[in-house]
Amino acid sequence: MRALVLLAAATACMAMPGPQSFPASLPASRESDQTTLGNKIHELGMDVSLGLQKSGNVVVSPLSISALLSVLMMGSAGRTHQELRRGLHVEDAHSENDFHHSFQRLMEDISSDGPDVTLNIANGLFLQRGAGIIYNFTHKARTHYNSVVSTLDFNNSSVASTKTINNWVNESTSGMIPNLLTQPLDPLTTFVAVNTVFFNGKWVTPFDPLMTTDMEFDTGAGKVQVPIMSGTFAINYINIPELKAHMAAFPYKGGRQAMYIILPRGQPIGNLEALEQELSAEKINSLIAKMRPLEMRVGLPRMRLSFKSSLRDTLKKLHMGSMFNPAAANFSRLTTLPVWVDDVVHETVIEVTEEGTKAAAATGALSFRSGNSNIFFVNRPAIIFIRDEVSGVPLFWGKLVRPEPLRT
C-alpha cells in the first residue's frame, strides 16, 4: 500500500486601512449558492481551529483546507467518502454535485489579479508515474478546482520530487512559503495534493507610517513590545455585550474582501477561547449585518502571523479518521491501488503593514486616552479573519495571541 500526502498553504499580505467601500453583487441565485457554500467552509474552518487546541497563535485558511478535502472527497468511496462529506457539511450525494459546481463558481468569482488586490487559489496534484490514477478523478479535479496535474517519480527521485513541489508552492505563494515540505517524501508516495491561497490586499487609505511606534501588547502571559500602527478612520463597528467583545471591519480596495477583528473585553486569554466557541457562521453573519459606520481611533500591530501544523489528529477528532488508516481508507475513485493519507500539513503566513512598508517608523509616545472616546486598540489577544464579502467565505481565520513584530 502507498501513501497520499495532502498539503495546504495560505498566505496574506496587506497594508492598513481607510474608509468603507462596498462589494459588487452577483446574480441572486448565484450569490445564494455561494453564501450557502461560504457557511459550510466557515463551519469547517471553525471546527479545525477549535480542534487544534493550541495555546499560541493559530492561523488557518478555511478556504484552502476545504478545497483540499473537497478534491479528496471526489476520489473517495464508502466510509471514507461519508466521513469527508459530513466533515465538509455536505448533506447527500445530490448536494455533493452542487457543492463541487458551487466551489468552481466561487473560485472563478473571487480570484483576482489586479493592482490593488490579488487573490490566487491554486491546486496541484502530483502523481507517481504509472500509479493507476483514474482519469475521471483528474478530469473532475481540473474542471471543478482548476487543478494542475503533474507526474513525478517519487519512487526513484523523492528528493527531486519534493523540491519540485516546494518550488510550486513557493511560486504560488509569491515566495512567502518557500519550504512547505522540510523532509524528502517517502519513496512509496503515490499522490500529493496541494492547495495554496495567496492574498495581497491594499487598504483604501493606508496608515501613516510616521504614526507607527512601539507599544506594549499584553499576551496574557506577559507583555511584549510591538510596533503599533494608528489612525482615525470611519469603520464599520459593533459592540457585542452578550459576548463581552467588540468587532471592527477594515475593507480592502474594491470592497470585495475585508479583515475583521473581534476584540474581547477583560482577561486576554480565557475570554478569547470562550469567545471562539460562540462564533458560528450564522452568528458571524448576523453580527456583520448589524455593524454600522463609526469614526474611531484605531491601533493595530504591524505584524506577521505564521502557523504550521499537521491536521491529522484534528481531522481524526472531527470524525474524518478512516482516510489515515491503511486498513480502512477507500480511495477507489482516485486510483486502482490501495492507498491512504499519510498526513495533512497546513501552513499559513499573514503579514499586516502600512501601505508604505519601507517608510521609517516614528519615535515618540502615542496616547489613546485623550480626544476620542471611540477606541479600537488591538493590544491584547483577538480573533482575526479575512472574509469575502459577497459569499461570506473566510479566506483566513486566526487567533492572535502573540504577534511577531514586523519592522521596516
Predicted regions and their residues:
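Detector for small/aliphatic-rich hydrophobic stretches
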Residues: 1-158, 358-360, 404-406
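A generic structural signal for residues located within well-ordered alpha-helices
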Residues: 63, 188-189, 378
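Non-catalytic, conformational "gating/processing" segments within enzyme and secreted inhibitor domains
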Residues: 55, 91-273, 282, 286-371
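Structural recognition of the beta-strand scaffold that forms the well-ordered cores
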Residues: 67-70, 126, 259-261, 385, ...
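C-terminal soluble interaction/assembly domains
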Residues: 346-408
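Short coil/turn residues that cap or connect secondary-structure elements
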Residues: 72, 76, 129, 173, ...
